[in-house]
C-alpha cells in the first residue's frame, strides 16, 4: 500500500481487520477458515466476484484452503496466481492432492523450499525464498508499554516472561509446557509474571491449565490476553521471550533474550551460534 499498490484483503476476519481498514486497505469477509463444503462454495463465489469487481491483477494466497479454491478459479479466470508457503503441511490422507501452490511460490525458509521440491516435485525456479520482514520502528527497545503494564497489573520489579503464538492444538505445546514449568520458575525468580498471547482452538485448554496453576500459587502469575494486535507492547515489558518464527524475530528487534521453542522443535536460548539453523527453518527449529 505504501508503495502505491491497491491492496485488497479477504479473510474470515479477526483482530487485524480494523488495523487494515485504518491503513486504507479494503477487507472482504470470506469464510475461508475451514473445509466445510458450504463455506468453500460460498468462498469460491465471493472470491470470483471480488477478483472481477476489483479488477485484481495478482492473486496471492497464504493457506491451504484459499489456495485450493483459488487454484480452481485460476484455471478458469487465468489471473496470475502466487502463494506463500509458511510451514510444512501434512501430506497424508490425500491432502497432498488438494494443495495448490500456484504458478510461483514464496517459501519463508530453505527447509520449506526443500519440502516443496521433495513432496510436490516443484521446480526450484518456481520457488523464491524470502524472510519475515520486521517493522523495527514498531518493534524496538524504545516501545512505550505503560498502558499494557497498567492493564495487566505489571509492576516495575516484576520478572515478566512473554509467550506469543496461535493457541491451536497444532501450535500450543510450548504454551502448555511453559505453564507447567511456572511453579518451578516461580521458586527461582522474584515477582514472576507470565503473559501468554494468542487465541485458537486450544485456548480453553490452555486457560484451564493456567487457572489451575494460578490457584495453586495463590495469585495470578499467568495472564492470558487472547488475540491481540499490540504485540510490540506485550513484548516490551518482558525479561525473556518464548516463541518461534515472526514473533521471535519481533522480540529480537525489541532487544529481548529469546528462547526459540515450538511444536516443531527446540533450539533454546538464541545466540549467534544458532543463527544458521534459525534462518534455515524460519526460526521455527523444525527437526531440532
Give each language-model segment a name.
Residues 2-39, 199-205:
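N-terminal strand-loop element at the rim of the active site
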Residues 28, 103-143:
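Donor nucleotide-sugar binding/catalytic pocket of nucleotide-sugar-dependent glycosyltransferases
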Residues 56-58, 233-249, 255-259:
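Acidic donor-binding loop of glycosyltransferase active sites
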Residues 61-67, 85:
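Short His-centered aromatic/hydrophobic patch
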Residues 75-110, 114, 121, 235:
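A conserved, positively charged/aromatic
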Residues 140-154:
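A short helix/loop element that forms part of the nucleotide-sugar donor recognition site in Leloir-type
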Residues 154-175, 179-182, 195:
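Conserved donor-binding/catalytic core segment of Leloir-type glycosyltransferases
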Residues 197, 206-228:
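Nucleotide-activated donor-binding/catalytic signature segment of Leloir-type glycosyltransferases, i.e.
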Amino acid at each position: 500500500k505504501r508503495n502505491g499498490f491497491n491492496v485488497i484483503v479477504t479473510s474470515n476476519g479477526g483482530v487485524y481487520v480494523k488495523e487494515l481498514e485504518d491503513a486504507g486497505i479494503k477487507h472482504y469477509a470470506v469464510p475461508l477458515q475451514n473445509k466445510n463444503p458450504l463455506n468453500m462454495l460460498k468462498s469460491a463465489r465471493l472470491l470470483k466476484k471480488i477478483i472481477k469487481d476489483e479488477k485484481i491483477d495478482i492473486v496471492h494466497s497464504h493457506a491451504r484452503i484459499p489456495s485450493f479454491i483459488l487454484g480452481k478459479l485460476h484455471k478458469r479466470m487465468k489471473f496470475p496466481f502466487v502463494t506463500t508457503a509458511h510451514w510444512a503441511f501434512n501430506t497424508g490422507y490425500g491432502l497432498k492432492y488438494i494443495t495448490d501452490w500456484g504458478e510461483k511460490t514464496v517459501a519463508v525458509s530453505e527447509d520449506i523450499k526443500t519440502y516443496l521440491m521433495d513432496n510436490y516435485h516443484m521446480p526450484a525456479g518456481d520457488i523464491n525464498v524470502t524472510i519475515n520482514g520486521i517493522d523495527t520502528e514498531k518493534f524496538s527497545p524504545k516501545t512505550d508499554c505503560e498502558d499494557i503494564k497498567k492493564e495487566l497489573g505489571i509492576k516495575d520489579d516484576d520478572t515478566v516472561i512473554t509467550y506469543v503464538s496461535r493457541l491451536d492444538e497444532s501450535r500450543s505445546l510450548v504454551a502448555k509446557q511453559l505453564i507447567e514449568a511456572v511453579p518451578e520458575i516461580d521458586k527461582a525468580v522474584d515477582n514472576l509474571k507470565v503473559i501468554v498471547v494468542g487465541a485458537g482452538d486450544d485456548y480453553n485448554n490452555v486457560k484451564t491449565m493456567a487457572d489451575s496453576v494460578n490457584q495453586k500459587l495463590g495469585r495470578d502469575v499467568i495472564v492470558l490476553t487472547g488475540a491481540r494486535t499490540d504485540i510490540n507492547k506485550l513484548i516490551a515489558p518482558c525479561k525473556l521471550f518464548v516463541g518461534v518464527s515472526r514473533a521471535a524475530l519481533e522480540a529480537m528487534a525489541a532487544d529481548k533474550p529469546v528462547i526459540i521453542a515450538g511444536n516443531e522443535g527446540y533450539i533454546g536460548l538464541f545466540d549467534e551460534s544458532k543463527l544458521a539453523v534459525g534462518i534455515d527453518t524460519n526460526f521455527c527449529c523444525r527437526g531440532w
